[in-house]
Amino acid sequence: MTRRDTPKFTAGQLNVYTRPGDVAAVTRALRATGRRIVLVPTMGALHEGHLTLIRAAKRVTGAVVVVSIFVNPLQFAANEDLGAYPRTLDADLDALRAEGVDIAFTPTADDMYPNGMRTTVHPGPLGAELEGALRPTHFAGVLTVVLKLFNTVRPDRAYFGEKDFQQLALIRQMVTDLDLEVEIQGVPIVREPDGLAMSSRNRYLDAVQREQAGALSAALLAGMYAAGEGTAAAVDAARAVLDEVPAIEVDYLEVRDAMLGPAPEVGMGRMLVAGRLGATRLLDNIAIDIGVPSGPGRQAEFDEHELPWRN
């Protein structure tokens, strides 16, 4: 058996690998020198939300930052937009160079699934709720590819955005239940000036739809302010905003607890919304304080709430 040498890695520049074995060998060698491996998984079409994840990863002392770019076919159903999903690899690599990323891992589907997509990770009951109720195979595909990325890169830490909050919760669940030695870091949603959560799919919206899409974050904001009166009041306030924009076909609007279990009567919760504008599906969510009376000074507390779209 011929031993393969470790692929070349040059510090101070972007190193691009497509084969899982190559990136595994490089990260293993770097880890042996005491470096920490930090992973930012993406599907490409990078925007400011992704770059915020990368910048958070780069703040880890001694980190080698690995960004994966892979449009995972396993998480798309037959009727979904796999073929239309934006692929901008050259521009993405330029963005990674500008951010000082160390490694880009850009496998093909054949690289990731050389024996076909036959073994998957079952997401459990939470994977059949919210997004999973509408996309029953989605989270099995997500968790499978994330586990494969973890097994290949062996990161000490991995960064995910909170926009896909259910995905983040399920990844944390998988790490706990399967005893994976990786720390998961969630990063707050990055928003456009009008509040729309940044997403690679936003580019599908025409000018009218783009303006209408701002109702999603406005609805969440209304729900957050009403949450002191309880969950039902929060949902009613958010629904009233969405009803003003009938072009948005709402798939769900729900309040859960911070781990996406049933909403508490009092305490921190998470309001989640998903809907369609034309052929484009959009997700958003926000943390809310449920059942806490307004009272003197409470408005000031809300005014200090972290709202990235307040300019």
Swiss-Prot record:
<comment type="similarity">
    <text>Belongs to the pantothenate synthetase family.</text>
</comment>
<dbReference type="GO" id="GO:0005524">
    <property type="term" value="F:ATP binding"/>
</dbReference>
<dbReference type="Pfam" id="PF02569">
    <property type="entry name" value="Pantoate_ligase"/>
</dbReference>
<comment type="function">
    <text>Catalyzes the condensation of pantoate with beta-alanine in an ATP-dependent reaction via a pantoyl-adenylate intermediate.</text>
</comment>
<feature type="binding site">
    <location>
        <position position="167"/>
    </location>
    <ligand>
        <name>(R)-pantoate</name>
    </ligand>
</feature>
<protein>
    <recommendedName>
        <fullName>Pantothenate synthetase</fullName>
        <ecNumber>6.3.2.1</ecNumber>
    </recommendedName>
</protein>
<dbReference type="InterPro" id="IPR014729">
    <property type="entry name" value="Rossmann-like_a/b/a_fold"/>
</dbReference>
<feature type="binding site">
    <location>
        <position position="75"/>
    </location>
    <ligand>
        <name>beta-alanine</name>
    </ligand>
</feature>
<feature type="binding site">
    <location>
        <begin position="198"/>
        <end position="201"/>
    </location>
    <ligand>
        <name>ATP</name>
    </ligand>
</feature>
<keyword id="KW-0067">ATP-binding</keyword>
<comment type="pathway">
    <text>Cofactor biosynthesis; (R)-pantothenate biosynthesis; (R)-pantothenate from (R)-pantoate and beta-alanine: step 1/1.</text>
</comment>
<keyword id="KW-0436">Ligase</keyword>
<feature type="binding site">
    <location>
        <position position="75"/>
    </location>
    <ligand>
        <name>(R)-pantoate</name>
    </ligand>
</feature>
<dbReference type="InterPro" id="IPR003721">
    <property type="entry name" value="Pantoate_ligase"/>
</dbReference>
<keyword id="KW-0963">Cytoplasm</keyword>
<dbReference type="GO" id="GO:0005829">
    <property type="term" value="C:cytosol"/>
</dbReference>
<feature type="binding site">
    <location>
        <begin position="43"/>
        <end position="50"/>
    </location>
    <ligand>
        <name>ATP</name>
    </ligand>
</feature>
<dbReference type="GO" id="GO:0015940">
    <property type="term" value="P:pantothenate biosynthetic process"/>
</dbReference>
<dbReference type="InterPro" id="IPR042176">
    <property type="entry name" value="Pantoate_ligase_C"/>
</dbReference>
<feature type="binding site">
    <location>
        <position position="190"/>
    </location>
    <ligand>
        <name>ATP</name>
    </ligand>
</feature>
<keyword id="KW-0566">Pantothenate biosynthesis</keyword>
<comment type="subunit">
    <text>Homodimer.</text>
</comment>
<feature type="active site" description="Proton donor">
    <location>
        <position position="50"/>
    </location>
</feature>
<feature type="binding site">
    <location>
        <begin position="161"/>
        <end position="164"/>
    </location>
    <ligand>
        <name>ATP</name>
    </ligand>
</feature>
<keyword id="KW-0547">Nucleotide-binding</keyword>
<dbReference type="GO" id="GO:0004592">
    <property type="term" value="F:pantoate-beta-alanine ligase activity"/>
</dbReference>
